Regions:
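Glycoside hydrolase catalytic-domain context in secreted enzymes
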Residues: 1-344
């Protein structure tokens, strides 16, 4: 029944290049079947508009897709890396970078960015230090809020703003020996005092979405960690946006020894992960899990509802093609104003 259509909103596949004929692509046929809530890393208004037309005109429910992309330090106009920007001690610089990025990205068909990365790290061996604001939780919190304000502005439904997605929740920068994806082992006291502030700051600034991290905390992967995703994020901090997994993170819980793909899909949904990035684990296991009573219809509904609310906030139900105006790209990309801001 309809619950399976609602489950389709929880899937975030990515198919890279869909040109020259997006409407004949594999992703288009999945959209028609109602299996896709969003896509990411597909660029350009032509391709995105065609896939959005498929969603609105050819799928049974006509629900528009949300389109995401990894934006770090600018889009067409390139700015200093986030670590460099944070060293300016000027949150207004970061806010301006995010505002300009939002205009350029929004002009290319995209409405959701996987930024900012606010992970605190004390280990220079970790390869992603450059994307954050360094070691200090207070500074990290200030800069996290500047990114969110710059991307989201005052009106998420404007075509010059993006929904931000704070990442990687949580403690991704504290991997043992700086090895990416490695285990994180620390007390809750250390976590809360030294690492968690920037995520909380982003929530206070009204960030629309949050991405889980690959690492374990207290030997439970963050993507299936109820204490992180429910007790702290939703209950303590009052986050009411939606949660997306990192790239294939749900399926990777199998490698963490949590169980088979059905077990990890159930664990992620119950912990509070609303959207499955590229693993297609939810797509593969939730129908069966519902039939077997391992999850409830209400759990699928609450995840679906959060994703639909985000699409509504972005104005996609009002105008699914609002980010797909081909004339805007020429005006926004590398404008004199943008380039002079970058040179400053």
């Amino acid at each position: 029944g309809d619950v399976y259509k609602r489950q389709g909103q929880l899937n975030l596949p990515s198919y890279g290049n869909v040109m020259p004929n997006p409407k004949k692509s594999e992703i288009a046929s999945r959209i028609v079947r109602g299996e896709v809530g969003g896509i990411f890393n597909i660029f350009g208004v032509d391709a995105i508009r065609q896939l959005q037309e498929v969603a609105v005109k050819e799928s049974r429910l006509g629900i528009p897709i949300i389109v995401g992309a990894d934006i770090c330090n600018g889009y067409k106009t390139v700015f200093p890396i986030p670590l460099g920007l944070s060293c300016s001690w000027k949150p207004e610089n970061i806010e301006e970078v995010a505002r300009i990025s939002a205009k350029e990205v929004g002009a290319d068909g995209i409405c959701w960015t996987y930024s900012p990365m606010v992970d605190i790290s004390h280990d220079a061996r970790w390869g992603r230090v450059k994307e954050g604001a360094g070691e200090d939780p207070f500074l990290g919190g200030i800069m996290a809020q500047a990114w969110v304000r710059g991307y989201q502005g005052n009106d998420l439904s404007a075509d010059t703003t993006l929904m931000a997605c704070v990442k990687h929740y949580a403690l991704y920068g504290a991997a043992e020996a700086g090895r990416d994806y490695n285990t994180v082992d620390m007390s809750r006291v250390t976590a809360m005092n030294y690492y968690m502030r920037p995520y909380q700051a982003a929530v206070e600034a009204g960030v629309g979405s949050i991405m889980t991290s690959f690492n374990e905390f207290e030997s439970i992967p963050a993507t299936g960690n109820t204490w992180l995703l429910n007790d702290v994020l939703r209950k303590q901090w009052g986050f009411n946006g939606f949660v997306v997994s990192d790239f294939t993170a749900i399926a990777e819980m199998v490698n963490h020894g949590i169980g088979n793909s059905q077990a990890v899909g159930v664990k992620a949904l119950k912990a509070g992960v609303d959207m499955d990035m590229i693993a297609d684990c939810y797509h593969a296991v939730l129908k069966k899990s519902l039939e077997e009573g391992k999850i409830t219809e209400a759990e699928i509904d609450s995840a679906c509802r959060r994703i639909l609310i985000a699409k509504y906030q972005l104005g996609l139900f009002h105008d699914p093609y609002k980010y797909c105006n081909p004339k805007r790209a020429a005006k926004e990309f590398l404008s004199v104003n943008n380039v002079s801001a970058a040179r400053r």
